[in-house]
């Protein structure tokens, strides 16, 4: 009898894979094992929970039991996999073990917390579980410090501000979204955040946190300090690679996979935020959706390489939303920026005047799909 496919993880990547497998094969045994409850929720909603006044349980879209029944699955929630015996094709928890024919690691990524004194006082919002643990503190907080001015930090800063909280956003860089685009392109959103009342501390560094009788004292560089009620780390994600490393798989920034989503072991695959696909870490929904479609075919013997088109990344800042695509972080691009009252179109071109990247905002986001077609793949 076939041992089937074992998937470690229950997030967006794992669920997309299950749905794609079941479209092609209703009977192959599928086992999912994860450390959380395995209830389904939409992770991007975490950027808007405070202004929407949502509790953690409000985010649940489908319970684990409903998921198992709908897709004919064996589920093992609240279960930590401790070890993979790749030679024996076995995964092990503290009290159990499972045989597999093919194994998929969909272990996601964890929030990076800066290693400063008092780091244990920082909260993270990388999962429903993490939000559940701190939702009362965040709801009650009047003054919030967000560490990191990237995509998630900018989304959270706007959301907390819209909820009426006093928000400070700190980042080492000279502009927000610095790893995604140059300052002349992000300045429109930066100006909007400032207009809304977000206090931006750019080119600034958090040096430590300390609990006080009236809140949390954040010590900054240049002999500055501020007192707040909550501190959120939004300083990026780190792919979860510990289990893959223990299994002897090749690891770089993430679990290394090829165009077939195959790791350095022929019967182990990886998908989602934990992966590095041919040298690229792509923690966005669209590449995960496309990867899940391809991996489902490969697990069922229809070998198909992953080919990723130019893809949109959406920054969900409702007062000034942005869509971007292409190599927006390239230093050698020349930016042509057209700003009107209804929005901005910024085109990044190379020395040959070839469009390599673009950023569009507000009502001009409808121009994104036309621009997307002109980007080289």
Curated annotation (Swiss-Prot):
| A Pfam family this chain is assigned to | Pyr_redox_2
Record InterPro entries: FAD-bd_OxRdtase, FAD/NAD-bd_sf, FAD/NAD-binding_dom, NO_rdtase_NorW, Rbx-bd
- Cellular component GO terms, alphabetically? cytoplasm
Supply the alphabetized keyword list.
Cytoplasm, FAD, Flavoprotein, NAD, Oxidoreductase
Where is this gene product found? Answer: Cytoplasm
Q: What reaction does this enzyme carry out catalytically?
A: 2 reduced [nitric oxide reductase rubredoxin domain] + NAD(+) + H(+) = 2 oxidized [nitric oxide reductase rubredoxin domain] + NADH
Query: Which Enzyme Commission number(s) are on file for it?
Result: 1.18.1.-
Which Gene Ontology MF annotations are present? oxidoreductase activity, acting on iron-sulfur proteins as donors, NAD or NADP as acceptor
Query: What cofactor does this protein call for?
Result: FAD
Q: Pathway, per Swiss-Prot/TrEMBL?
A: Nitrogen metabolism; nitric oxide reduction
Family that this chain belongs to: Belongs to the FAD-dependent oxidoreductase family.
What is its biological role? One of at least two accessory proteins for anaerobic nitric oxide (NO) reductase. Reduces the rubredoxin moiety of NO reductase.
UniProt-listed HAMAP family: NorW
Cited NCBIfam families: PRK04965.1
Q: What is this protein called?
A: Nitric oxide reductase FlRd-NAD(+) reductase
Task: Give the species this sequence originates from.
Answer: Escherichia coli O17:K52:H18 (strain UMN026 / ExPEC)
Q: Source organism lineage?
A: Bacteria, Pseudomonadati, Pseudomonadota, Gammaproteobacteria, Enterobacterales
């Amino acid at each position: 009898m076939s041992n089937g496919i074992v998937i470690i993880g229950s997030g967006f990547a794992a669920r997309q894979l299950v749905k794609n497998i079941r479209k092609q094969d209703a009977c192959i045994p599928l086992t999912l094992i994860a450390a959380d409850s395995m209830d389904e929720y939409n992770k991007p909603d975490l950027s808007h929970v405070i202004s929407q006044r949502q509790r953690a349980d409000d985010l649940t879209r489908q319970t684990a039991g409903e998921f198992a029944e709908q897709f004919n699955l064996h589920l093992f929630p609240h279960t930590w996999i401790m070890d993979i015996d790749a030679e024996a094709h076995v995964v092990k928890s503290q009290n159990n073990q499972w045989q597999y024919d093919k194994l998929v690691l969909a272990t996601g990524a964890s929030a990076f917390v800066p290693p400063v004194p008092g780091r244990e006082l920082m909260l993270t919002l990388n999962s429903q579980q993490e939000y559940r643990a701190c939702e009362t503190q965040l709801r009650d907080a009047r003054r919030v410090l967000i560490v990191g001015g990237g995509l998630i930090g900018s989304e959270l800063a706007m959301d907390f501000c819209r909820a009426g909280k006093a928000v400070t956003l700190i980042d080492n860089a000279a502009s927000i979204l610095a790893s995604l685009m140059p300052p002349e392109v992000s300045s429109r959103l930066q100006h909007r955040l400032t207009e809304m009342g977000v206090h931006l501390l750019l080119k600034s560094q958090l040096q430590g946190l300390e609990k006080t009788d009236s809140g949390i004292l954040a010590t900054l560089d240049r002999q500055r300090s501020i007192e707040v009620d909550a501190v959120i780390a939004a300083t990026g994600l780190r792919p979860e690679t510990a289990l893959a490393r223990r299994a002897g798989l090749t690891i770089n920034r993430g679990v290394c996979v090829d165009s077939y989503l195959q790791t350095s072991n022929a019967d182990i695959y990886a998908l989602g935020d934990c992966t590095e696909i041919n040298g690229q870490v792509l923690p966005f929904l669209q590449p995960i959706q496309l990867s899940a479609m391809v991996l489902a075919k490969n697990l069922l013997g229809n070998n198909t390489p992953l080919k990723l088109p130019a893809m949109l990344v959406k920054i969900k800042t409702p007062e000034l939303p942005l869509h971007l695509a292409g190599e927006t972080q390239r230093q050698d691009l020349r930016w042509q920026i057209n700003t009107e009252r209804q929005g901005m179109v910024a085109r990044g071109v190379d020395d040959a005047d070839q469009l390599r990247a673009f950023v569009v905002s507000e009502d001009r986001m409808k121009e994104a799909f036309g621009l997307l077609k002109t980007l080289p793949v």
